[in-house]
């Protein structure tokens, strides 16, 4: 109601102002006419009243007495002093009444217009503010003033034009009305504003957090004159870092894994923090790539350093960890506890040495947890019961030498055969079941402990599942095939320990490796086998311990010795073209041919 009263009062003040302007103009016009009459009287001699003038005045007085106003002359006739003095009282009265006639009628018209204006304004105010629509006040004033001017009897064309110009000038100069605090609060708490703000802030937040190149051309026109793969390698860019000041500080990243059910989730395991002896020795943190939050999604811990970790492939809520004490622990994110919901016993039936290898293999209806410890013991578990292993086997070479396993990998689609790397630098093939269960072939080539091993994962028109790569303390990465016990190729571009290696899950010729100098290398064997296709060194040059590709192959995660996890976007380098499989097959043929030539040259030198 206060807004309506203010608007009504404002309109009344505008009307009064217009009336004052009209009165002022009228007064000035009368003064001007009076001055002109005085000037003319001074210039011209006073003529004697003629008989015609006297009769005209009598006639005009008679007409005015009966209510008829005579037509005013176009040019005002100067009046002599004698005529003023001779005029009778009746004439003076009739003249006064004649002069006041138009003014009286104009005032009556103004009263009528004011009443009509009150009737017109109220509905417009209600309609305008019932919709809570903010409109400029000057617009209403302009419309109403125009209506007012149309209803008032016009004084003349010249006066109307002047008044319209004055009104337009006032409208232009009038500043927008400032909203009161009450009106602002009403808008801020209105349902429409809250819905709009809630929807818009989500869009703006996503736009501010988006780091990808929105101008990328998927048609590839920008790469037509360049080597597409090499150019895409430049897209290896830093995405984000996972680090928690409390749980990650002074800990080493020992293992990482991505969730199959939720591709944005990754779990990382950490060893003990020597500066915090009262904190749990083992920690596993679940990080979320989807949101730009800096804290882990879940925090799990146990009393022994976690050396290996993985998501239970067919159980999206379970996380499996292998500890330095030999225990296998199981965490459940549905539980409110951060400690394991299940764990294996510390007994001779299970592991009693550090477990560096945990892996869930099988199908949805038939799967097992496979674990291997550094004493060469392999156990098969059911995730429903970790009190005792379903199967156990000693990995022994020549029936006397236990294999100190440091890494394990299963070929794609195989749950029986696998390969393991050992502390002495030897790689073995092994089998879980059958007449040849246990250690099979021996692959010698590394001069130091094997730190990482991974089988070819990309599925395509040509089967490369027999290939695997290994990394070692001897500063090299080697390419192997299960069909031959000698390495196919040795990549020797690193100048420090190579701690881990992994094939791309989508590109047949691409793998990543990390070393002790904090360098991440991406090798595309279809481009070059001598130098990496793309490389990046992390800030601080901390040693990189682990590397893991995301399921889609677009991102690669690396963990360092300071507890930090670095996520890098690989870009178009990770996207395979249709001919990548055939090109890689030709590359392997060339590698085998070069290896055969080298062996022949070596044999010739030995014979000589």
UniProtKB/Swiss-Prot annotation:
Modified residues (Phosphothreonine): 88, 139
Compositional bias segments (type: Low complexity): 80-90
Domain of life: Eukaryota
Start and end residues of each stretch annotated as Disordered: 1-106, 132-184
Biased composition range(s): Basic and acidic residues: 1-13, 20-60, 165-184
CC terms in the record's Gene Ontology section: cytoplasm; cytoplasmic dynein complex; kinetochore; microtubule; spindle pole; vesicle
GO molecular function list: dynein heavy chain binding; dynein light chain binding
Subunit description: Homodimer. The cytoplasmic dynein 1 complex consists of two catalytic heavy chains (HCs) and a number of non-catalytic subunits presented by intermediate chains (ICs), light intermediate chains (LICs) and light chains (LCs); the composition seems to vary in respect to the IC, LIC and LC composition. The heavy chain homodimer serves as a scaffold for the probable homodimeric assembly of the respective non-catalytic subunits. The ICs and LICs bind directly to the HC dimer and the LCs assemble on the IC dimer. Interacts with DYNC1H1. Interacts with DYNLT1 and DYNLT3. Interacts with DCTN1.
Family of the protein in this entry: Belongs to the dynein intermediate chain family.
Official protein name in the record: Cytoplasmic dynein 1 intermediate chain 1
Lineage: Eukaryota, Metazoa, Chordata, Craniata, Vertebrata
């Amino acid at each position: 109601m206060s807004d309506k009263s203010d608007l009504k009062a404002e309109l009344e003040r505008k009307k009064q102002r217009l009336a004052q302007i009209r009165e002022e103009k009228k007064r000035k016009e009368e003064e001007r006419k009076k001055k002109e009459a005085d000037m003319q009287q001074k210039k011209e001699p006073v003529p004697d009243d003629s008989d015609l003038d006297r009769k005209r005045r009598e006639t005009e007085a008679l007409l005015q007495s009966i209510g008829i106003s005579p037509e005013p002359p176009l040019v005002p006739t100067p009046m002599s002093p004698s005529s003023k003095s001779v005029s009778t009282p009746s004439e003076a009265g009739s003249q006064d009444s004649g002069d006041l006639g138009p003014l009286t009628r104009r005032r009556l018209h103004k009263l009528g217009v004011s009443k009509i204006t009150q009737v017109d304004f109220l509905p417009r105010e209600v309609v305008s503010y019932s919709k809570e629509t903010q409109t400029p006040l000057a617009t209403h004033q302009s419309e109403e003033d125009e209506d007012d001017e149309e209803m008032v009897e016009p004084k003349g064309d010249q006066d109307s034009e002047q008044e319209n110009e004055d009104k337009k000038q006032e409208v232009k100069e009038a500043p927008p009305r400032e909203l009161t605090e009450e009106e602002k609060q009403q808008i801020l708490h209105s349902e429409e504003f809250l819905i709009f703000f809630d929807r818009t802030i989500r869009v703006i937040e996503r736009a501010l957090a988006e780091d990808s190149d929105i101008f990328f051309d998927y048609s590839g026109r920008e790469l037509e004159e360049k080597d597409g793969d090499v150019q895409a390698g430049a897209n290896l860019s830093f995405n984000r870092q996972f680090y928690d000041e409390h749980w990650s500080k002074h800990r080493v990243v020992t293992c990482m894994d991505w969730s199959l059910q939720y591709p944005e989730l990754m779990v990382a395991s950490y060893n003990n923090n020597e500066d915090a002896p009262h904190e749990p020795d083992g920690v596993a943190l679940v990080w979320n790539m989807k949101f730009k939050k800096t804290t882990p999604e879940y925090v799990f811990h146990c009393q022994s350093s976690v050396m290996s970790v993985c998501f239970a492939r067919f159980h999206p809520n379970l996380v499996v960890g292998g500890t330095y004490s030999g225990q296998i622990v199981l965490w459940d994110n549905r539980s409110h506890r951060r400690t394991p919901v299940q764990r294996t016993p510390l007994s001779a039936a299970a592991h009693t040495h550090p477990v560096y290898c945990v892996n869930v293999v099988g199908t949805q209806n038939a799967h097992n947890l496979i674990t291997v410890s550094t004493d060469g013991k392999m156990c098969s578990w059911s995730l429903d019961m970790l009190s005792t292993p379903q199967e156990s086997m000693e990995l022994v070479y020549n029936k006397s030498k236990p294999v100190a396993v440091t890494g394990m990998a299963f070929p794609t689609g195989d749950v029986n055969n696998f390969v393991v790397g050992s502390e002495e630098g030897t790689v073995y093939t092994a089998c879980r079941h059958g007449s040849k269960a246990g250690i099979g072939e021996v692959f010698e080539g590394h001069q130091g402990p094997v730190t990482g091993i991974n089988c070819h994962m990309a599925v395509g028109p040509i089967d490369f599942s027999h290939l695997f790569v290994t990394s070692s303390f001897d500063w090299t990465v080697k390419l192997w095939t299960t069909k031959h016990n000698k390495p196919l190729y040795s990549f020797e571009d690193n100048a420090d320990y190579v701690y881990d290696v992994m094939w791309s899950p989508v590109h047949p010729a691409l793998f990543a490796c990390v070393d002790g100098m904090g360098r991440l290398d991406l090798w595309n064997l279809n481009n070059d086998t001598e130098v990496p296709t793309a490389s990046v060194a992390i800030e601080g040059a901390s040693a990189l311990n682990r590397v893991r590709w995301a399921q889609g192959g677009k991102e690669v995660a690396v963990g360092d010795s300071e507890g930090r996890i670095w996520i890098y976007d690989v870009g178009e380098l990770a996207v395979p073209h249709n001919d990548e499989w055939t090109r890689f097959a030709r590359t392997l043929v060339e590698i085998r041919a070069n290896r055969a030539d080298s062996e022949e040259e070596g044999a010739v030198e030995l014979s000589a």
